[in-house]
Amino acid sequence: MAFDKDTIIASLKEASITDLSDLVKAIEDEFGVSAAAPVAAAGAAGGDAAGAKDSFDVEMTESGDAKVKAIKAVREITGLGLKDAKGLVDNVPSVIKEGVSEDEANDIKEKLEAVGAVVTLK
């Protein structure tokens, strides 16, 4: 099947957001794919796997259903303003805090999981 890429792009530019959202869902259903961004695999960088890790990055991979509570928790943990905290929660996966000790990382993880977020430590 031949198609003109420029014609399709022009048609998409004219479509409403609702129509585009419906189109994405239909494509996902038809082809069994997801429009979600892929998450990088942990541990791909190598390094000393047997050694104890000194610092951890706390990454929120899912914000959960209670986004307002997640935003409040992120603000409390990071000291960020409302807009920045909301940006982290809305754009998961996102690193909440970098280079923290294991104890602090686990405390942050517990706080975020308590409000329904899914968190990984890297």
Swiss-Prot record:
Gene Ontology cellular component list: cytosolic large ribosomal subunit
Gene Ontology terms, MF aspect: mRNA binding; structural constituent of ribosome
InterPro entries on file: Ribosomal_bL12, Ribosomal_bL12_C, Ribosomal_bL12_C/ClpS-like, Ribosomal_bL12_oligo, Ribosomal_bL12_oligo_N_sf
Domain of life: Bacteria
Protein's recorded name: Large ribosomal subunit protein bL12
UniProt record similarity statement: Belongs to the bacterial ribosomal protein bL12 family.
Gene3D superfamilies: 3.30.1390.10, Single helix bin
Record keywords, A-Z: Ribonucleoprotein, Ribosomal protein
Transmembrane segments: none
Function, in words: Forms part of the ribosomal stalk which helps the ribosome interact with GTP-bound translation factors. Is thus essential for accurate translation.
Subunit (UniProt): Homodimer. Part of the ribosomal stalk of the 50S ribosomal subunit. Forms a multimeric L10(L12)X complex, where L10 forms an elongated spine to which 2 to 4 L12 dimers bind in a sequential fashion. Binds GTP-bound translation factors.
Stored PANTHER family: 39S RIBOSOMAL PROTEIN L12, LARGE RIBOSOMAL SUBUNIT PROTEIN BL12M
